[in-house]
Amino acid sequence: KTCEDFMFSLAYYQYIHNFMAINTPVYYYRQNLNSATGKRALQHGLDYQIVFTNISNVFNLQNFPKETTNIFQRRWTRWIIDLISNYKSQNLKSKDIEAAVYSQPYYTAMMHFIPQGILHRIELWLLKKKYSRGIALYCNIMMHFKHLLKRYKL
């Protein structure tokens, strides 16, 4: 089996009992259009709630350093922001976006996400104020800005 999407694949995470983080790249990750990460649909967001809870429990049981937990929280936050920024291609309505963004545990993760830089502070402020349309507009602007700069991440 391919491990291309190992870190983000539901197939692996559904049965997780243990988790280990290392500070060395094991493989080169690329986004597979047929993978769970390639299909940014609302249903994946709802499915990931189970995954998030399981991994959070593993972090708590194994007493992982705060830095490791923060890395996980940041990755999760970026995924939700990407989900919102791609809402047009998924035909998601504003209420569907709001339901995904403000459902637990995503909202809690984002509220505890440590702001780093102006972009993260803007995102955090929009989330605290619960401006769903503002978040969607902001993400669309950033998505086009990223495209112009040919950058992958915000």
Where are these regions (language model features)?
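Secondary-structure edge/capping motif, primarily at the C-terminal ends of alpha-helices
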Residues: 59-62, 83-91
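Generic structural signal for well-ordered, non-membrane alpha-helices
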Residues: 50-57, 78, 143, 147
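Membrane-interface aromatic/basic loop that binds lipid-linked glycans or pyrophosphate carriers
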Residues: 89-154
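Amphipathic alpha-helical repeat scaffolds of TPR domains
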Residues: 71-85
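Short, charged, amphipathic alpha-helical segments
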Residues: 66-74, 97-100
